[in-house]
Amino acid sequence: MEYYNYYSANAHRGDYDIGFKVDEMITRTRYLVSEFIGAKENEIAFTNNTTDSLNKIILGFFENYLSDGDEVLLTKSEHASNLLPWFELKKRKNIVINYIPLDEDLMVTVENVRRSITPKTKVISIAHVTNVVGDERPIKEICSLAHDNNILVVCDGAQSVPHIKINVKDLDVDFLAFSAHKMLGPTGVGILYGKEELLTKFKPLIVGGGMNVTFSSDGNVTYSDIPFYFEAGSPNVAGIIAFGNSIKYLNEIGMEKIEDHVLNLRQYAVSKLEEIEDIKIYNKNINTSIITFNYNGISSTDLALYLNEHNICVRAGTHCAKVLKDELGINDTCRISLYLYNNKEEIDYLIQTLKNITY
């Protein structure tokens, strides 16, 4: 509200005090994001969401980087946002998409990654934490293995950055995408991180104001340096400023405390869910925020609607990971997503509500 009330101006355009204030606040958020994940400020570009970031990475960089016959490694537990852009790229270029096998617990192992690499493999695009199984992938080890074989790594961090202390330099990941709205921030703000030397090799996907230095009527254009090169048009100023405040709040609490709280709550929830005979948990031994389950004889949608009547919000369906059903052997599930604002009393209420089911 402060932005709208006191300095509601556009960014990077105004030669007046409220414009300078907007530029200062956007720079502040960029700095906070860079510090939060251990990156340089010019390696942080603002986007609309994780989906937008992944599309820009895949179609803005890899369309030029990959050649016919090059192979991309994915997994069948990826979110649509880390699959569909690759499918689109495959329509434009003669690339090959292969899938890293999942183990019996639907997890990715370094050994399975190693076995999947061929001389043609050029990129591994993988979630750090998946949004259905909730498994945390060994990204640092995968990056080390990939780089030993001259392979780049794209990381979908939508489910990990809000929950786990991340340092991109330590992980050595080449690209990382995540969203503000999963970490107490507003919708409509995403982050594209990339190593500086890679970001300078992107082709522009969206062009216009704010991302050029000069252009002339004959079509000659000089584009801005990174990260402004990725930020054409008027940005979501209010959202970006708010995201900076969200990061400050998370830092004040401490990511380690958040992770401990969520894991303790998850263990408690799983132990209580196991008391209900008709509940099947698909990711019992995972140490992240996600619990995926079904209730015997009730569709996931019907269960979610029943819980909604009691003011309990769970996600039902395929969770945008429609290929995973081939591995799970079922079409849909219910998903509980825990965060720092949840508590044991809420878990107890959920369990009692589930125990009250009669049919």
Residue map of PLM features:
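Pyridoxal 5′-phosphate
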Residues: 1-359
